[in-house]
């Protein structure tokens, strides 16, 4: 073998960039293997980062010193906080990105990262020795030795593009697929499935009639993703909004038999929550129109991404569709939309560190695990990279659970339940939404990142200063109080019960905000506005957070009951069905067992009682 590394990451997309830099931050000698450095960090589909649920993941990546938030801030050309009118728990930061700036910023991060080298080439085979991963071989026969491999191949594993009746092998447009790795996975014993995703046509913005569409500005001022970004300096743009028309739907209905999805050419599952335009028309036939967001792809690029009309219909049909849409009747299509099928591994083959159970030292992240989306991929990449570095160095693994963050929710969903279609993150997937907010990701995760060694010194100093300021602000707000009569002088109506209420308690009232309490106590005006926002949210949710804390403690009790090496045939009282499901899934804890289909509360009680009995036996044996 020509060289040796602690960790090798295959693939330079969103998962691969986070995995490689996370491993490198942990001190592992890391190599990132990618076809070309010039395509590292490319946004293959939509030119946007974040959104509902997804924005939470970006903030969590940032809290652990990952790249996506900082890079998105550097390249963002329109920032919007989605669900702003709803509670903070379900708000989702989102940014429209300049594709070229995003890739350039990501490539700069990769080039400047310590402990990281980039190897241009195609990984073709996994090398196994003594029952664990030992290295990789490239298609040009170069081989590299390693202690851990992270595979982040996106849509490249036996990728097949579909456009109308035509199809051809590709990882994405104009790029070859990865064929050898699929063979390698099958040789090792993995069963590969097929999934599908799609992308819309790209349009020439210079030929769009912008006067015929609604224009949508971003937030002013824009709110960054990263706590390390003081302000956004990139020029901001507006997006357009238009709709499909009944005439659009007629064109689609007349040609739907030519869509690979409906002709039988594609049999794999696509993302339920990001359907193709032909899917929308067939499934929602009563709708007279579907919204389309016209998203510019860059400040010096006229290309526009029409979000909402992903399609794989033939090129001439796509042109006919566009001609029926307001603002697009004379548009020039730069590139047609298409669908792509690719191989994936059943994520139930993984443990919560994203290491495969079948082959120690092999980690998987991103679309190979059945997810869809840049943010889902990046979060998995970070977790896989951290754990690959720990595995290569002989350290203890790090597991993020469902109470830690959305990245823990996603990974637990994947490794426990598996997937039948591409997995996308939503806030509704999290049980502890009030705790797992986008605004407090650093409060939840950065201390953990500092302890494990993946957070740099600059961020650690910034975080400690912020937490000290928040603590001091809460102490001040808790120390200041008024009676109901005193509050009435400031126009605040409270229950006349004679009880004094602190500024923090007043903030819990829906109609009382920071401005009202600062009017009573001018000293509160000296508190940093960002800290004040956090304090007000904490106050509004305080009583509910206390209840949720009890729920989290109960969850963690179940998670602490470890099922390692349990012989389920030796557990009396379990049904044959429960035994079979537990043996097949091999859950890590009683809590994880409870999230398996078909495992009843009675079965969980039997498992908990069995573990307690076994623990008592071990204690008795040790003391004898």
UniProtKB/Swiss-Prot annotation:
Subcellular location: Cytoplasm
Residue positions binding NAD(+): 270-284
GO molecular function, one term: flavin adenine dinucleotide binding
GO cellular component: cytosol
Family annotation (SMART domains): GIDA_assoc_3 (SM01228)
Keyword terms, alphabetized: Cytoplasm, FAD, Flavoprotein, NAD, tRNA processing
Cofactors (names): FAD
Pfam families referenced in this protein's UniProt entry, alphabetically: GIDA (PF01134), GIDA_C_1st (PF21680), SAM_GIDA_C (PF13932)
Gene3D superfamilies reported for this sequence: FAD/NAD(P)-binding domain (3.50.50.60), GidA associated domain, C-terminal subdomain (1.10.150.570), tRNA uridine 5-carboxymethylaminomethyl modification enzyme MnmG/GidA (1.10.10.1800)
Binding positions (FAD): 11-16
Domain of life of the organism encoding this protein: Bacteria
The keyword NAD appears for this protein: yes
A GO biological process held by the record: tRNA methylation
Entry function: NAD-binding protein involved in the addition of a carboxymethylaminomethyl (cmnm) group at the wobble position (U34) of certain tRNAs, forming tRNA-cmnm(5)s(2)U34.
NCBIfam families to which the protein is assigned, alphabetical: mnmG_gidA (TIGR00136)
Self-association state and partner proteins as the record states: Homodimer. Heterotetramer of two MnmE and two MnmG subunits.
Family: Belongs to the MnmG family.
Name listed for the protein in its UniProt record: tRNA uridine 5-carboxymethylaminomethyl modification enzyme MnmG
Species assigned in the record: Nitrobacter hamburgensis (strain DSM 10229 / NCIMB 13809 / X14)
């Amino acid at each position: 073998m020509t060289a040796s590394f602690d960790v090798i990451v295959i693939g330079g997309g969103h998962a691969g960039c986070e995995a490689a830099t996370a491993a490198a931050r942990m001190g592992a000698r890391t190599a990132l293997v990618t076809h070309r450095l010039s395509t590292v960090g490319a946004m293959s589909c939509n030119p946007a980062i974040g959104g509902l649920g997804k924005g939470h993941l970006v903030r969590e990546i940032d809290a652990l010193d990952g790249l996506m938030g900082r890079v998105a801030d550097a390249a963002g050309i329109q920032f919007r906080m989605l669900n702003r009118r709803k509670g903070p728990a379900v708000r989702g930061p989102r940014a429209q990105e300049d594709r070229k700036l995003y890739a350039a910023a990501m490539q700069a991060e990769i080039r400047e990262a310590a402990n990281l080298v980039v190897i241009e080439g195609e990984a073709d085979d996994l090398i196994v020795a003594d029952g664990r991963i030992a290295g990789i071989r490239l298609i040009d026969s170069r081989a590299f030795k390693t202690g851990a491999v992270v595979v982040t191949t996106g849509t490249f594993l036996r990728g097949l593009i579909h456009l109308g009746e035509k199809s051809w092998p590709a990882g994405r447009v104009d790029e070859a697929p990865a064929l050898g790795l699929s063979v390698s996975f099958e040789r090792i014993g993995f069963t590969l499935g097929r999934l599908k995703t799609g992308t819309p046509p790209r349009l020439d913005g210079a030929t769009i009639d912008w006067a015929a569409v609604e224009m949508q500005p971003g937030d002013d001022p824009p709110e960054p993703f990263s706590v390390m970004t003081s302000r956004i300096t990139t020029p901001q743009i507006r997006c357009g909004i238009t709709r499909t028309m009944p005439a659009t739907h007629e064109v689609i209905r007349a040609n739907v038999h030519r869509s690979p999805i409906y002709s039988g050419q594609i049999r794999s599952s696509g993302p339920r929550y990001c359907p193709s335009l032909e899917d929308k028309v067939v499934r929602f036939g009563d709708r007279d129109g579907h919204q389309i967001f016209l998203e510019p792809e860059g400040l010096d690029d006229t290309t526009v991404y029409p979000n909402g009309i992903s399609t794989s219909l033939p090129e001439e049909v796509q042109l006919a569709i566009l001609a029926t849409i307001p603002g697009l009747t004379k548009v020039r299509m730069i590139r047609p939309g298409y669908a792509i099928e690719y191989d994936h591994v059943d994520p139930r083959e993984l443990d919560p560190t994203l290491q495969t159970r079948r082959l120690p030292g092999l980690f998987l992240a991103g679309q190979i695990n059945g997810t869809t989306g840049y943010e889902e991929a990046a979060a998995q990449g970070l977790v896989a990279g951290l754990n690959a570095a720990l595995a290569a160095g002989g350290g203890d693994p790090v597991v993020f659970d469902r109470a830690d963050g959305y990245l823990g929710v996603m990974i637990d969903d994947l490794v426990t339940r598996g997937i039948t279609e591409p997995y996308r993150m939503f806030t509704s997937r999290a049980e502890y939404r009030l705790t797992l907010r986008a605004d407090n990701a650093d409060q939840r995760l950065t201390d953990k990142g500092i302890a494990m060694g993946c957070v740099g010194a600059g961020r650690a100093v910034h975080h400690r200063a912020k937490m000290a300021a928040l603590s001091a602000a809460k102490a001040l707000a808790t120390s200041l109080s008024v009676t109901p009569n005193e509050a009435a002088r400031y126009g605040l109506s409270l229950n006349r019960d004679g009880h004094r209420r602190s500024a923090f308690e007043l903030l819990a009232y829906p109609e009382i905000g920071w401005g009202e309490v600062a009017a009573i106590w001018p000293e509160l005006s000296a508190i940093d506005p960002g800290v004040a926002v956090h304090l007000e949210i904490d106050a509004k949710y305080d009583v509910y957070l206390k209840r949720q804390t009890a729920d989290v403690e109960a969850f963690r009790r179940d998670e602490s009951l470890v099922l390692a090496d349990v012989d389920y045939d030796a557990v009396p009282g379990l049904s044959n069905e429960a035994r079979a499901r537990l043996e097949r899934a091999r859950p890590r804890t009683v809590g994880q067992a409870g999230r398996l289909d078909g495992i009843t509360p009675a079965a969980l009680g039997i498992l908990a009682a069995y573990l307690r009995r076994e623990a008592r036996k071990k204690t008795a044996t040790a003391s004898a």
